[in-house]
Amino acid sequence: MVPVHAHDYVTDPPSTTGRTLDGLTLPRVFADAVHRGGDAVALVDGEYALTWSAWRTAVDALARGLQESGVVSGDVVALHLPNSWEYLTLHLAAASVGAVTMPVHQGNAPSDVRALLERVRPAAVVLTARTQEGGGPLTGPALREVLPELRAVLVTGDAAGEGTETVTEMLERWSGEDPLPVEVRPDSPFLLLPSSGTTSARPKICLHSHEGLLTNSRAATEDTADAYAGTLITACPLTHCFGLQSAYSALFRAGRQVLLSGWDVGRFLELARRERPSVVVAVPASCTTWSPGCARTRTAPASARPD
């Protein structure tokens, strides 16, 4: 089960917002988006694109794969990944089996990632392939030695190291299979979100429920909801709540999500010219480099130009 300790998590948020929660769960929001989107393109990651129907199939396969690995409702699935189709698909898969996602920032040092994992003791960890090089603290054998509860170590890329499996291997093995039924309630644990750690050596970890985080995401963007029915570029990390909120907002409107794996002005402008986004989600520091880039090229689409 999710390890909840008073010094780590806020478990009783104030009830003085004046707005009731919407009773949402991520599996239901995703199912509604799939129904609306059908065979339209839902997710773009570089040259890799998924329609809503294909994304549903991939989510189901990885959900079943997690279950067959031993992940059960309430377990934690840690994602230490850049923006990618693997990240969002595994987040959806984990939610559909009642598991709790913990995003871990790419900028964290391996020792800091390891410290977070040892605190939370996840049932599954998903990492980039480069973390398995050189016998570091995030290799499959090293993690399994200190995390006896660990049932799966997944890596991106084409080659699995010792004690790991690639995301693609799990996807292919369980393709066409549905996950075993699990009750996911609006008040079920959904996300463990660590703070940046800039105020102490021990990051705080906040526990969010499905309805709490999703209601907030819908409320935050409801004034501009129609724009999210178009094409959205997420140019900030999905390991931050701001990045995740952009993904949820697109799901509410069955919008097309385009991912930028890391900030680079040239790659962003190229992507914006190609995709013609109606919404770009980025942090202010990125936008300070975006404006000069647009001025130099004079070729960014109007929809992607800052005012």
Swiss-Prot record:
Family named by the database record: Belongs to the ATP-dependent AMP-binding enzyme family.
Q: List, alphabetically, the InterPro entries matched.
A: AMP-dep_synth/lig_dom (IPR000873), ANL_N_sf (IPR042099)
> What's any GO biological process attached to this entry?
antibiotic biosynthetic process
The residue range of the signal peptide is none
Q: What protein name does the entry list?
A: Protein Y
UniProt superkingdom? Bacteria
Write out the function statement from the record. May be a p-aminobenzoic acid-CoA ligase that activates PabA to start the biosynthesis of candicidin.
As one GO molecular function, the record gives: CoA-ligase activity
List the pathway annotation: Antibiotic biosynthesis; candicidin biosynthesis
Query: Which keywords appear in this protein's UniProt record, sorted alphabetically?
Result: Antibiotic biosynthesis, Ligase
> What organism, scientifically named, is this protein from?
Streptomyces griseus
